[in-house]
Amino acid sequence: MNSWNINLEDMMEAGVYLGHQARKWNPKMAPYIFAERKGIHIINLTQTARFLTEACDLLFNTAKNGEQFLIVGTKYQAADLVALTAKKSRCHYVNQKWLGGMLTNWTTIKKRLKKLQELESLESINGFDRFPKKEASNLKRQLAQLRKYLGGIRHMTKLPDIVIIIDQQHELTALKECLILGIPTICFVDTDCDPDLTDIPIPANDDSRASIQWILNKLTNSIREGRAFSKNDSIN
């Protein structure tokens, strides 16, 4: 047990240790694999604890400085968990489809966010009623689309300082954009992933809801604690 209350028993219970089928492995994950059981790779939870602690320390210290975080997880097992934990920790999030250029084409995304704000303002005063039926319908459809894909980053005013990625394989486009821009990443890496592509790889089962939730809670709690520490510091 350590300062972030990361213990092996909890990780076992959440199924964090279960990797993919051995035949699907990435050899770069060898240092993080404990064994093979019935054709399934078993993740070394000591390594998971080590990197999760490192990630929590980084997030805590970064949150103290008031930095911005983005959580990306669009697979069905993760989508609602991403939204829930991100809102609790006041992080930005993407839990639907990742739109290419969300980070690398930030100027265009900012314009879309402005459009989202304009349409929501219009909706709040029943402004759609002023338009012909067909035009109002188009505007409502546009608003629904913008909310769906950009709702989680509506308050993002600049590129994030750190991006947390739930499934490296599933979110490869997002990861590549971070690499291009030099944005640090923390990634869940299952046994079929490439740990070299991320700044802090967390070896873990990225398919189990319990595993995703357990690790996400640790990461976002460290952000919340960092922000609380910052507030207390400014009061003293």
UniProtKB/Swiss-Prot annotation:
GO terms for molecular function: structural constituent of ribosome. CDD domains: RPS2. Pfam families: Ribosomal_S2 (PF00318). The lineage of its organism: Eukaryota, Viridiplantae, Streptophyta, Coleochaetophyceae, Coleochaetales. SUPFAM superfamilies: Ribosomal protein S2. The gene is rps2. This is Small ribosomal subunit protein uS2c. It comes from Chaetosphaeridium globosum (Charophycean green alga). Its main location: plastid. GO terms for biological process: translation. It is found in: Plastid, Chloroplast. One of its GO terms (cellular component) is chloroplast. Belongs to the universal ribosomal protein uS2 family. HAMAP family: Ribosomal_uS2_B. Disulfide bonds: none annotated.
